[in-house]
Amino acid sequence: MKKISILGSTGSIGKQTLDVVRDNRDKFEIVAISANSNIELLLEQIVEFKPKYVTVFEENKALKLKEMLPKNIEIEVLAGMEGLKIISSLDEVDVLLTAVVGMIGLVPTLCAIKKGIDIALANKETLVTAGELVMKEAEKYNVNILPVDSEHSAIFQCLNGENKKNIEKIILTASGGPFRGKKKGELVNITKNEALKHPNWSMGRKISIDSSTLMNKGLEVIEARWLFGVEQENIDVVVHPQSIIHSMVQYTDSSIIAQLGCPDMRLPIQYALTYPDRMESSFERMNFSKFSTLTFEEPDLETFPCLKLAYECLKMGGTYSSVLNSANEVLVSEFLEDKIGFYDIPYYIEKTLEVHSSISEPTLEEILETDRWSRAYVANLIKK
């Protein structure tokens, strides 16, 4: 039985992870869970899955959760970053699933790696901001980094049993988001509610906005570079509106291996939790007669400049990707609060990148300092 700790159990990926566990009680045990502030749902999860530890990032909410707990439930309630670090490095945990949004996942992930705990990674910002550092640590401590993103899970599976020296290119597929086919002039006054309507996937608010700007795909390009050790010029993005092919690998002999399946995040979650094995599931099976046509097109970098910015940051190296990520987090939050427009997101990111003095091969402290600088700088830009 695998023992699991989940960072972000009340979010979209966290809830779907618990769906997988719920259907396979004999295979998995939940040791610890965490949330930012949604203690009502967290309490329901505690009652159902009976973890030994829970962390609430907002300390006042952690105190409130303690008051809400039924007297017959024994659980250690922790708070803040310290709490996340503790539940990420418990001796009894086999797999840490990181499903928190943003930079908050980096330090706990490194804590888990140093304890030799395998990582089921749904928090792409960890590799975007500190990919080189994280992968070196994973190699040092002999830890598996198991991707939960559908695209990276697909590539991971396509590489199984293959020699990485034979990779010619990685091909990440993108749905194109809710605005595929639109031009810039049509998107200037777009609202958050329109941007949140993803055509194929059930996702959280932040990642839904990232999908609408194609920043999500840009972050995935950076993540793929570190996860699979492939240079950026060998990572392509192709828009595939049906989201049936989740990604592909082209080899030096011209062969392409692809991973297909119905759009369901529970599949890559389950694979990450059961790796290197596969486990039966009740997930929907492919009916090829329903998909008589699979289409592909080039991404429109003029309409969706965030993808281009991500490629540029990867090429420049150093801490540029960290600035890209941090600025984007701030700007997406502002957009979701109706404080800025859709195209303010790439505009302010570019302005922040222009003044950044990059650090090559940054330490953890330098990455965290870059994150703080970027957030403060872009917040100040918006105020002006």
Swiss-Prot record:
Pathway(s) served: Isoprenoid biosynthesis; isopentenyl diphosphate biosynthesis via DXP pathway; isopentenyl diphosphate from 1-deoxy-D-xylulose 5-phosphate: step 1/6
Single Gene Ontology MF annotation: NADPH binding
Top-level taxon of origin: Bacteria
Binding-site positions, 1-deoxy-D-xylulose 5-phosphate: 124, 150-151, 175, 198, 211, 216-217, 220
InterPro entries per the UniProt record, alphabetical: DXP_reductoisomerase (IPR003821), DXP_reductoisomerase_C (IPR013644), DXP_reductoisomerase_N (IPR013512), DXPR_C (IPR026877), DXPR_C_sf (IPR036169), NAD(P)-bd_dom_sf (IPR036291)
Cofactor: Mg(2+); Mn(2+)
UniProtKB keywords: Isoprene biosynthesis, Manganese, Metal-binding, NADP, Oxidoreductase
Enzyme class at the top of the EC tree: oxidoreductase
Alphabetical GO biological process terms: isopentenyl diphosphate biosynthetic process, methylerythritol 4-phosphate pathway involved in terpenoid biosynthetic process
Reactions catalysed according to its record: 2-C-methyl-D-erythritol 4-phosphate + NADP(+) = 1-deoxy-D-xylulose 5-phosphate + NADPH + H(+)
Binding site for NADPH: 10-13, 38, 123, 125, 204
UniProt binding sites for Mn(2+): 149, 151, 220
Keyword Oxidoreductase: yes
EC number: 1.1.1.267
Role this protein plays: Catalyzes the NADPH-dependent rearrangement and reduction of 1-deoxy-D-xylulose-5-phosphate (DXP) to 2-C-methyl-D-erythritol 4-phosphate (MEP).
Family statement drawn from the similarity comment of this UniProt entry: Belongs to the DXR family.
Name of the protein described by the UniProt record: 1-deoxy-D-xylulose 5-phosphate reductoisomerase
Species of the source: Clostridioides difficile (strain 630)
Organism ancestry: Bacteria, Bacillati, Bacillota, Clostridia, Peptostreptococcales
Protein encoded by which gene: dxr
